[in-house]
A protein has these predicted regions:
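N-terminal capping/linker segments that flank leucine-rich repeat
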Residues: 1-140
């Protein structure tokens, strides 16, 4: 029973199904990005220790309709976070209408290695910078 509890405590349980889909589709050795999308999604268990190895995380909400970014808490050693809403070409730009998408950005507040946060085409203002005091925050 104790061994089972220890094993379960090492598994990443995602609150947002689209965030999980993004991880399964784009997670590499130490980065998560659509630029390096996998041929086949990862199947099975996602271990917390593998997410801690990520130093770069990028999610395009045009492809993954994430509503809750609190799952960022698993990426404790990330250095760069890019959250964006963009299509394949420059004309295909809009604003992500998920009003509260950045409500849980405070999950990264104590990430010691976080140096850069880029937010593109999201409902964000300068108050977001308070959630990431150790990082340079770029909003467009």
């Amino acid at each position: 029973m104790i061994i089972c509890m220890i094993l379960v405590s090492r598994i990443a349980f995602f609150k947002d199904a689209e965030f999980l889909r993004a991880v399964r589709d784009t997670m590499g050795k130490n980065r998560m990005s659509l630029a390096h999308k996998r041929e086949k999604p990862i199947k099975g268990i996602i271990w917390k220790k593998n997410l801690k190895k990520m130093n770069f995380l990028s999610i395009n909400f045009k492809d993954y309709h994430v509503k809750d970014i609190s799952d960022l808490e698993y990426f404790k050693n990330v250095e760069t976070i890019i959250l964006t809403y963009m299509g394949d070409n420059e004309e295909d730009i809009g604003m992500y209408n998920e009003e509260h998408i950045l409500d849980n950005l405070n999950k990264v507040r104590d990430f010691n290695k976080l140096r850069r946060v880029q937010l593109y085409h999201l409902n964000a203002d300068d108050s977001v910078k308070k959630e990431c005091p150790k990082a340079m925050v770029f909003i467009d």
